[in-house]
């Protein structure tokens, strides 16, 4: 037991880390799209083939047809793969050319930018005691008087 370690060593399989997805080594990551489609359509044929048998009622037939229909819908979605999340992405991350992101940490520390306009209650809501930053506010008001 002296040499045992409880840390998980990451392993990379086909560009996927086992820390991100533990099944990367043995899961479905290695299958290509065509393999999945072929296996799926063969499964559809088997499901339809199960309708010809010795069952008496229609309950089994209904279940087989519904599950087969769901499998077909899933295969068609997988085949055409709509990019729904990309179409619906809000463009808030898209910035205009030349945009420079403010240094929010510096602005908070020096009470400049949007942080300079906060009231005492707003400062307290983000755990900043107004009395501790009064000297920064005095410096800002002195600059405004000079202008």
Curated annotation (Swiss-Prot):
Entry annotated with the keyword Membrane: yes
Keyword Oxidoreductase: no
Keyword tags: Cell membrane, Membrane, Transmembrane, Transmembrane helix
Superkingdom, natural source: Bacteria
Membrane topology, record value: Multi-pass membrane protein
One Pfam family here: DUF2631
Compartments, as annotated in UniProt: Cell membrane
GO cellular component entries: plasma membrane
Chief location: membrane
Signal sequence, start to end: none
InterPro entries reported in the protein's UniProt record: DUF2631 (IPR024341)
Bilayer-crossing regions: 35-55, 62-82
Subunit annotation: Has been detected in a cytochrome bc1-aa3 supercomplex; its deletion however leaves complex activity unaffected.
Protein name: Uncharacterized membrane protein Cgl2017/cg2211
């Amino acid at each position: 037991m002296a040499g045992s370690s409880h840390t998980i060593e990451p392993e990379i399989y086909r560009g996927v880390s086992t820390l991100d997805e533990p099944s990367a080594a043995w899961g479905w990551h290695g299958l290509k799209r065509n393999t999945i489609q072929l296996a799926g359509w063969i499964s559809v044929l088997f499901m339809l083939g199960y309708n010809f048998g010795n069952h008496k009622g229609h309950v089994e037939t209904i279940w087989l047809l519904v599950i087969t229909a769901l499998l077909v819908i899933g295969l068609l979605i997988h085949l055409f793969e709509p990019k729904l999340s990309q179409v619906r992405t809000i463009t808030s991350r898209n910035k205009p050319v030349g945009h420079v992101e403010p240094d929010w940490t510096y602005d908070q520390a020096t009470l400049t930018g949007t942080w300079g306009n906060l009231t005492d209650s707003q400062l307290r809501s983000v755990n900043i005691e107004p009395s501790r930053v009064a000297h920064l506010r005095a410096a800002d008001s002195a600059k405004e008087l000079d202008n």
